[in-house]
Design a protein with these regions (language model features):
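Active-site-flanking beta-strand signature of metal-NTP-handling nucleotidyl enzymes
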Residues: 2-9, 62-64
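Short, conserved charged micro-motifs
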Residues: 13-19, 71-75
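An amphipathic, aromatic/His-enriched active-site/gating alpha helix that lines ligand/cofactor pockets
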Residues: 25-37, 52-60, 64-103, 109
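Carbohydrate-binding/catalytic loop surfaces
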Residues: 44-52
Length: 109
């Protein structure tokens, strides 16, 4: 499996519930096109523990998207990059709610 960690903050005035609803619609849209396997739950950072050692980033929210393999991930990017419908508006509904996104990808060994 191939995974992508999304680290982000919300733009002012956007609730995590609004983001979650938009993200769920986007995931369903991508699953229907076989462009994503699954998306995990949204997590809120708990930086007040000694186990949180990342001082470079100040993101509040995280979630993991899972793809069957790197090829599926690459196809999902190819689907999004042209900014064409039907994908454009549903992706924009998610991406427009976030600030300072960082994406980290890895593949299971």
């Amino acid at each position: 499996m191939f995974h992508m960690l999304t680290c982000f903050n919300l733009k002012p005035g956007v609730s995590i519930e609004e983001f979650g609803q938009a993200s769920a619609r986007f995931t369903k849209h991508m699953q229907e096109r076989e462009l994503v396997h699954s998306t995990g739950p949204i997590g809120r950072r708990q930086s007040n523990t000694i186990m949180d050692t990342d001082s470079e980033r100040n993101h509040e929210y995280f979630f993991i998207t899972t793809f069957l393999d790197r090829a599926q991930c690459d196809r999902s990017v190819e689907y999004i990059l042209p900014h064409e419908e039907p994908g454009e508006s549903i992706h924009h509904a998610v991406y427009s709610k976030v600030a300072d996104p960082v994406f980290i990808c890895w593949e299971d060994l």
